[in-house]
């Protein structure tokens, strides 16, 4: 029997997915259905770009609904109660310094569905997060990244 993939995420990440799902079901889906109905009224569907566009959007919306439903069904909410306060784990903000003397950087490790590196949120599946998870403040860690490796010192965990 195939093992189902779990989707680790923060409670905030789950709430955002639930909100997106509600928006897709209650707003976007009806809008697309209405666009299809209007486009059909134009007649010949074989050369109807509005109809094709609306059908493409419908496929996207339905695909995203299905994707979110699966993620929520197999969501695993991260709970750090049993993790030491100075240990790197999901849902925590980590500040580290690339050695020997780079400027400190801070990221929060989140589930794949929540990752947004430009907002300081990296996926638990990223090489950086995988290298940091489980280590503690003060540890120096060598992390394998796509173009080699880097050595970092963990400065803080919040």
UniProtKB/Swiss-Prot annotation:
Coiled coil: 49-69
Region (Disordered): 102-125
Keywords: Coiled coil, DNA-binding, Transcription, Transcription regulation
Pfam families given in the database record: GreA_GreB (PF01272), GreA_GreB_N (PF03449)
GO MF: DNA binding; RNA polymerase binding
Family stated for the protein in its record: Belongs to the GreA/GreB family.
Protein name: Transcription elongation factor GreA
Species of provenance: Limosilactobacillus fermentum (strain NBRC 3956 / LMG 18251)
């Amino acid at each position: 029997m195939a093992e189902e993939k779990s989707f680790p995420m923060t409670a905030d990440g789950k709430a955002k997915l639930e909100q997106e799902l509600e928006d897709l079901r209650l707003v976007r889906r009806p809008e697309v259905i209405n666009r299809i109905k209007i486009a059909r009224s134009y007649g010949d569907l074989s050369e109807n770009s509005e109809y094709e566009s609306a059908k493409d959007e419908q496929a996207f919306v339905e695909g995203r609904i299905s994707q979110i439903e699966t993620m929520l069904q197999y969501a695993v909410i991260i709970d750090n109660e049993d993790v030491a306060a100075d240990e790197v784990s999901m849902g925590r903000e980590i500040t580290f310094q690339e050695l020997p003397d780079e400027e400190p950087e801070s990221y929060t490790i989140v589930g794949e569905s929540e990752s947004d590196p430009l907002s300081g949120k990296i996926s638990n599946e990223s090489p950086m997060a995988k290298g940091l998870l489980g280590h503690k403040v003060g540890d120096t860690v060598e992390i394998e990244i796509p173009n080699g490796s880097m050595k970092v010192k963990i400065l803080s965990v919040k």
